[in-house]
UniProtKB/Swiss-Prot annotation:
Localization terms from the record: Cell membrane; Cytoplasmic vesicle
InterPro entries in alphabetical order: CHIC1/2, Golgin_A_7/ERF4
Coiled coil: 46-73
Recorded name of the encoding gene: Chic1
GO cellular component, one term: plasma membrane
Protein name: Cysteine-rich hydrophobic domain-containing protein 1
Composition-biased stretches (Low complexity): 24-44
Organism expressing this protein natively: Mus musculus
Region Disordered, residue ranges: 1-84
Amino acid sequence: MSILLPNMAEFDTISELEEEEEAATSSSSPSSSPSSSSSSSVSGPDEDEEDEEEEEEEDEEEEDEEEEEEEVPPPPRVVSEEHLRRYAPDPVLVRGAGHITVFGLSNKFDTEFPSVLTGKVAPEEFKTSIGRVNSCLKKALPVNVKWLLCGCLCCCCTLGCSLWPVICLNKRTRRSIQKLLEWENNRLYHKLALHWKLTKRKCETSNMMEYVILIEFLPKYPIFRPD
């Protein structure tokens, strides 16, 4: 027993040391908790400030991107059609040369080749196109004249209603000439940068209106010009 007592004493001292360590740790834990709370309280505003700075930087980056998107380079300069037409030559008028005119539409157009069209279109093609228009008028105008005479004779009895047939016939004649000119344009003249159309103009000798053939010069677009 004398031998075991020292060993038991050692065991007692070890257990006492363990109890003292546990007491020390328990006493240190409350003291450390305020420090941690204070550190968290101190670190909290710093983190908020950092978050605000990051948000401001993101907002600035978004604004910079929007400004870059808004500052798009201007589109390439394009020449407008009105600008090209302004510098085009004046159109050519082909007036009526017949001895009968019904509601401003003569029974014949002048077949003389205008000098302005020299180098633009062949005189033979010009005379052929005018000949087609004159042949259309030659067929339609005599019928219109007959209906006009009948309408004038019966005008008093019908209160002017007898003039409606000749008005409709004259409108149909104009439409047939317009279709003929469109066919001529698609066939030849658009390729030569010309455009034929039937339009109204004042007479040279009076203030009355008459139908003439207007030959316009189409603008040539600069297709080889860089953007």
